[in-house]
C-alpha cells in the first residue's frame, strides 16, 4: 500500500516538473562562430584573417558565415540574399567537411548553438549553400539567426541583445532602423545588422567621432584634370578658360574657338587653351586683339609713291599728275600726247615735254627768212635787209625736268659747215638775262650749253645760241643762230 502511494506521488512530481517554466541561456557557439559577451550573441570568425595560408595553390580566401571558401583569384563572387527553406530546429549535426564539397554545420542535440556556416577545402566548388558557374560563385547566405530554441517547444528562451522572441519561439533580429529604435543622426543612414545596427555617413562624408564631416575630394588628387571645386558631400571639376569638360566630367579638352564662336574679324588660329587673331595684309590688330584696323601706308612713309599716295582699305595706290601715268605701281612716266592724241593744227607740229605738250608752227621763219628745210630758215644774200641779220636760224626744242641738279650739260651746238681759214666762236646772244646758262666751247666747231642754276617749272625759256665765223685773212664774216626753246616740266620726274 505504502509502496503504491510512493510511486503515485513520484509520478505526479515528474509530470508537474514537465510544465515548470525554465530560462535557458546559451553561451556556446558552433564551429566557425565565437560568443560575443558584449552583444550577447554568436559572431562569425574571419578564418581568412586568423588562419595562416588558409588557401593554397594561388587561390584566394573568401570569408563566409561559419567558414570560408578558397576560390580562383579571377572568380567573381555574387551574393544571393534569397532566403532558402530554414532547417528544422531539431536537425542533427553532420560530420566534418570532405574534399570537393562544402560541409554545413547545424545544431547538435547537446544544445550547442549552431552557426549555420560552412567550411570548404581548397578545391571546393559546390555544396548545399554554394552555387558556382564557370567563373562566378553565387553564395547563399543563411538568414537564420545563430540561435535556436531547444527541441522542446514548451521551454521559454532568453534572446541576446538585439534579438526578440518570435511567435514561433525563435530568436529573430530586431530591425532598429525600421522600428525607429536607433540613435543615428539626421545626416546619417541607419544600416541594420544581425542583432544590432550601425550608422553610416552619406556619400561624400566620413565619420569623425560621432559626426559626419565632408570629404574634401579636392585634397586627394588627381580627381580633376585641371580645377577641382569641393561641395558639401561631393565635388565637381572645372576647366581653365579655353577648355571644356569632356563627357567623363573629369578631363579638360581644348575648345576650338575658331570653329565654335569665331570672334576674329579676319583670320583665326586656334592654339591650346586659347586662340589668336591675325589680319590680312594691309591691316593690323586693334587694341582689343580681335578686330582689324586699316594701315595707312601713306602716313608710314613718304617714299612709297613718286607723286601722291592714296590710302585704301587694306592697301594703297599711287597717283600721278595730269600728263603722267603710273608705271610699276609707284612711279610716274610722262605721257607722250604727240603719239596719242593732241590738239595741234595741221600747220603745227606737236612737241612733247615732261607733263604735257605744245604746238609750234611748222614754218617758224621770221620776215626776210625763207624755210629751206625743217626748222631751218635762211636769209638770202640777195636781200639787202639780210646784211645785218644772221645768215640762218635753226629752231630746236628740248624739255628738262624741274629742279634738275646743277651744273648740268644740257645741249650741244655744232657747226654744220666748215670753211677753210676761218675761226668759230660761240656765245649766248639772248635769253640768259638771269644767268641760268653758260656756253662752254668744246672744240673749234662745237660748244656745250650748261645749266648752272636750277629751274622750276612749268616754264619756257628761249635761248639764242650764236656761232660767229670769221675769216683768218679778214675777208669773210658771218653768223648763224640756233634758237633753242627749253620747256621746264612742272615736276622733277
UniProtKB/Swiss-Prot annotation:
A single GO CC term for this protein reads: extracellular matrix
Note the SMART domains from the entry. EGF, EGF_CA
Q: Name one GO molecular function term.
A: epidermal growth factor receptor binding
Q: Does the keyword field hold Chloroplast?
A: no
The UniProt function text for this chain reads: Binds EGFR, the EGF receptor, inducing EGFR autophosphorylation and the activation of downstream signaling pathways. May play a role in cell adhesion and migration. May function as a negative regulator of chondrocyte differentiation. In the olfactory epithelium, it may regulate glial cell migration, differentiation and the ability of glial cells to support neuronal neurite outgrowth.
> Origin organism of this chain?
Mus musculus (Mouse)
Q: In which tissues is it expressed?
A: Expressed in the eye in the ciliary body, cornea, inner nuclear layer of the retina, and in the optic disk.
Q: Name one GO biological process term.
A: post-embryonic eye morphogenesis
Which protein is depicted? Answer: EGF-containing fibulin-like extracellular matrix protein 1
Please give the residue ranges the record annotates as the region Mediates interaction with TIMP3: 259-493
Domain of life, per lineage? Eukaryota
